[in-house]
Every structure is written in structure tokens, then in C-alpha cells.
Amino acid sequence: MSTLYSRLATLSALAFAVSSLFVGCGGSGGNQKDEPDAPSVDEVAFARGADVSWASEMEYDMTHNPSRISGTAFKDSKGNAGLYPVLKAAGINAIRLRVWVKPEDPNGWSGKDDVVNMAKRAAEAGMSVMIDFHYSDFFADPSRQKTPADWVSFDLKGLSAKVTEHTKDVLSALKSAGVTPLWVQVGNETRPGMLWETGRLYNDKGEIAGGWSNYAALSNAGYDAVKSVFPAAKVIVHIDNAYEDNTWFFDKLKAAGGKFDMIGLSHYPMTNSGMTWKAMNSSAILNIKTLAAKYGCKVMVCEIGVRDTASDLAVSTQCITEFMSSVKSLSVCAGVFYWEPQVDGKWKPSIYEKSDRNWGAYSMGAFTSDGSTFSPTSILSAFGGGDS
């Protein structure tokens, strides 16, 4: 999702889609104690999910670096305490976690061990799990798909082997920990390809010769690795800009032999100065229907976020309410995941403070802080449909 910092920066076939939804598109750290419910890995009818990949670092800061964060606990108005209980009370039933190969931070946030720990907590809380492989040491998005530092010397064959090895390693660790993810992304917002330059699709001169075949090979290495560990997991190919017609991308991927079980989209309806949020929501709904109809599979909105400032709260809540009402009625949509809802618009991860980066805080969370407690706003209530 960090693409926000770089970009902040048909219906006639629907009947066919409904009848063919179950045909595979591909063809051929925390310090807070949560009180868990019974673990569950059953398919959810509709995912109201949250990507909380920053939660471990936030909880670490609450204990070890209090000057970096404006609160010491997650709690809601009903008395629920701990991030997962608060999210569950708000209606969240699934958790998404990103995976980096060799994270920059020495604490290893979003590395294998952190992801396994967070996934275990989610499963113990009775939530479904999505794993989001970036195949990078940092955010992979439309502005950057940087090959991990330890992989840069490999050619296509070698990179495919590293994708296989890394995917199996992380998923096998999850399996050993008793976690069975329902969904696995093989790449994050991969509209421009992945693992640049080998898997890059375009440059300033246009489409790169051989780019699609390379990208498909790398993506398929991830797909096959997922199926070798969790055969029933839905493998997602994820791109940005749900408001755009994205059929061209999946046409090209399919033509190159790419495999996927589900399509993933990002939707940030308040980030395009050329469109109103209502227009972006409407376009996203139409495109979800179109993609599902054309490729015979469900669509997951893997990321969503709206502005969290006090002056925007009312309209942001309305935006989320209207989108969730529309998308929930679609049998072709598998669910929606809010990106990092637990932040308050002030806290930011330490890696954002590097001198060559110096990024601001993420301003599309769904929590607020009174200086001691992080609690949900009306945005999370509208998104989850539960109490807060």
C-alpha cells in the first residue's frame, strides 16, 4: 500500500460469472495479551479484514519506545482490550499480513518470525488469515518492485527458485505453528511486474520484450509453492486502482500462462483529485463485476483506506459506509481488507524516518488516540459493521 506515498499518490456477462465462480481463474511481536476464541480456518462468507502488519512495532513502541507513540493500549468504548478483541468487536473477521524477505528494521518487523507470531494470534482469535508476499525487503507497489538484496545476482531461473524457497519457508513455518491461511498473495500491487528488472513489464520506453513471460514465470513459482504447502488456499494476484478497467492486465497475464485463483485490487477512493469518491466507488463496483464475469472467479479488495483527519471523519465514514453496502451485496466479491486501521495519523514505523526517506505518518487509519489509549473511530464501525 505504501504506493499512497508515491501517488499522494460486461454486466451482461455477470450471469455467467455467478455460475462459474468456483472454477479456478488460473486454470490448468506484540506485548499485549489477547483473550482468544477457538481457532477457526473455515471459509468466511464475506471477509471484513484488516491488514495490521504494523501492529507488532506499535505494541513494541508502547512498551519500549513510549516517546514514539501516543498511547499504551488498544481499547474500545465497550471495554474490549487488546488489538484483536477490539477488531473482532468491530466486526473484523480476517487479518492480512505482509511478508518481507529481509526487513530493514533490526527487529524484523514483517519478517517470517513476526508474521508467524501475528498470524498465530489472529488464528487463536478465530480470525481468517491472508498472507501477502511482497518478494522484496521493503514495500513492493507500482512505484517500486525491488528485488531482495540477497537475490540480485540471480537470473530468471534462479529468482523463480528463490520465490519457491521463500514462499515454502514462510508457509511451512505457519503450518508448523498451526495456522492455515485462506488466501495468499503472490506479489503486492504488481501492475508493473515484480522482482525488477527481471520481472518488470514496462519502462519509460513502453512494454519490455519478454516481460510478461518473465513475470508470469515468477508469479507461477509463487502459485505452485503455495499449493505445495496449502493446496486449498486461494492464490491472489493483486494490483492497484480498483476504479480502472483492469481487464487488459489479466488478459496479458493469462496469455503468458499466469495462474491465479482470485483477483485482488486496492481501492483508495479519496486519493484521486480527478474523481470524486462517489465516482471512484461506483467505478470500483463495476470493475469488480466485470473482472469476476470475465475470468470466472471472485474478487477481493485487498486494501482500502479513507482519510482519518477530524475534518474528514464524517465524509470518510459515509464513503466507507456506501462502498461496503454496495460491495457486500455482490456475490462475486470475497471481501474487503482495511489497510492498517489501527494507526492514528501520528505514529509511523521507524523505517519511515530514514534520512533518505523521511516519510510522514499514514493518514488513512481508523483509530484515534487520546494520549493513553488507541480506540476505533466511526470509520472502523462503518467498515466492520460491529460495535466500537
Where are these regions (language model features)?
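Bacterial N-terminal signal peptides that target proteins for export
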Residues: 1-12
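Bacterial Sec-dependent N-terminal signal peptides
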Residues: 2, 16-42
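Hydrophobic faces of well-ordered beta-strands that scaffold small-molecule active sites
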Residues: 48-52, 95-97, 129-133, 182-186, ...
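Glycoside hydrolase catalytic-domain groove-lining segments
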Residues: 83-84, 232-234, 242-315, 325-328, ...
